[in-house]
Amino acid sequence: MPSQSVKECQRCNALTKSGQRCKNRTCKSGKCWVHLKRDTGLRVKPSQVSGGGMGLWTTKRIKPNQLIGKYTGERMTKAQVNQRYVTRKPQYVLCSGNRCVDARKTNSSAVRFANDARGTRFKNNARLKGLSLKSASKGIPAYREIFTGYGSAFWVNR
């Protein structure tokens, strides 16, 4: 299966107001933080979760049940995931049935930075549906971190 943007860092893929390609470099999504915020209303910055690394934040209100983004990366089967991660746990792998996406080395989507609020004082305010992230039925206020449940399979042996 084809992969999507499997590079550690790249030039921003957004266009400036003058129609030129942005010259900023990005390592977290396909767009630099300026264009990610402008085009999607999202930011990647440190999480409020202790040990959570980076988190996905909104800069504008997200309506109830609104698509936040798609989980993208290297497309794999569960068997391929098991072969790759024999000695370590997959941190950025999301599976829906036998279809899996490994976003460990991709920067095509900021959705991979949504953390799970399990075991914290925060509550999940978004949900994964297949390989897409949607806001919960109440929506998400502006300037909040986006949390989603990873599912019980993720938490086995952690």
Language model: regions and residue ranges:
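Intrinsically disordered, low-complexity regions enriched in proline, serine, glycine
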Residues: 21-24, 34, 70, 80-81, ...
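Intrinsically disordered, compositionally biased terminal peptides
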Residues: 1-9
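Catalytic cores of histone-lysine modification enzymes
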Residues: 39-121
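Eukaryotic intrinsically disordered and solvent-exposed regulatory patches
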Residues: 18-19, 52-58, 132-136
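C-terminal SET catalytic tail plus cysteine-rich post-SET Zn-binding segment of SAM-dependent SET-domain
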Residues: 5-6, 118-158
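Cys/His-rich Zn2+-coordinating "finger/knuckle" modules used by eukaryotic regulatory proteins
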Residues: 10-38
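Eukaryotic short linear interaction motifs
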Residues: 19, 64-65, 77-78, 142, ...
